């Protein structure tokens, strides 16, 4: 074998060895990243699962919201909705009944006089 072939073979072996070492470093790094992600995900799940899912209605009931919210209109809403459902079909067929009824309901919920409600606000 010639000296040139031996040198090129040694050089190729050196490059291949370095590439394999680099690949092992990358694999180790990737494994470490995956383990870190798993650990942080488990920690996050422990933290998040300790809180029960809540709705804004629950927060209002528990008075946790920073601003006080007037819930009196929420109480009226069920009553007004029931009243609307109880109206006969004959009245619903009247073309003026629905706009007038919605204006009346809006004024009850918003505590405003019907004449003071801007048209675009309904």
From Swiss-Prot:
Give the matching InterPro entries. Flu_C_NS2
Q: Where in the cell is it found?
A: Virion; Host nucleus
Q: Where is this motif: Nuclear export signal?
A: 96-105
Annotated Gene Ontology cellular components are: host cell nucleus; virion component
UniProt keyword annotation of Membrane present: no
Supply the Pfam families for this chain.
Flu_C_NS2
Function comment: Mediates the nuclear export of encapsidated genomic RNAs (ribonucleoproteins, RNPs). Acts as an adapter between viral RNPs complexes and the nuclear export machinery of the cell. Possesses no intrinsic RNA-binding activity, but includes a C-terminal M1-binding domain. This domain is believed to allow recognition of RNPs to which the M1 protein is bound.
Q: How does it assemble?
A: Binds M1 protein. May interact with human nucleoporins and exportin XPO1/CRM1.
Q: What name appears for this protein in its UniProt entry?
A: Nuclear export protein
User: What organism is this sequence from?
Assistant: Influenza C virus (strain C/JJ/1950)
Q: What is the lineage of its organism?
A: Viruses, Riboviria, Orthornavirae, Negarnaviricota, Polyploviricotina
């Amino acid at each position: 074998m010639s000296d040139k072939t031996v040198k090129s073979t040694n050089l190729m072996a050196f490059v291949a060895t370095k590439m394999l070492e680099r690949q092992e470093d990358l694999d180790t790094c990737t494994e470490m990243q995956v383990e870190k992600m798993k650990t942080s995900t488990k920690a996050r799940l422990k933290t998040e699962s300790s809180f029960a899912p809540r709705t804004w209605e629950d927060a209002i009931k528990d008075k946790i919201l920073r601003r006080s919210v007037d819930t009196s209109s929420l109480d009226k809403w069920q009553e007004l909705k029931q009243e609307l459902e109880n109206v006969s079909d004959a009245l619903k067929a009247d073309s003026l009944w629905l706009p007038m009824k919605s204006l009346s309901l809006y004024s009850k919920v918003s505590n405003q006089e019907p004449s003071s409600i801007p048209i675009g606000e309904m």
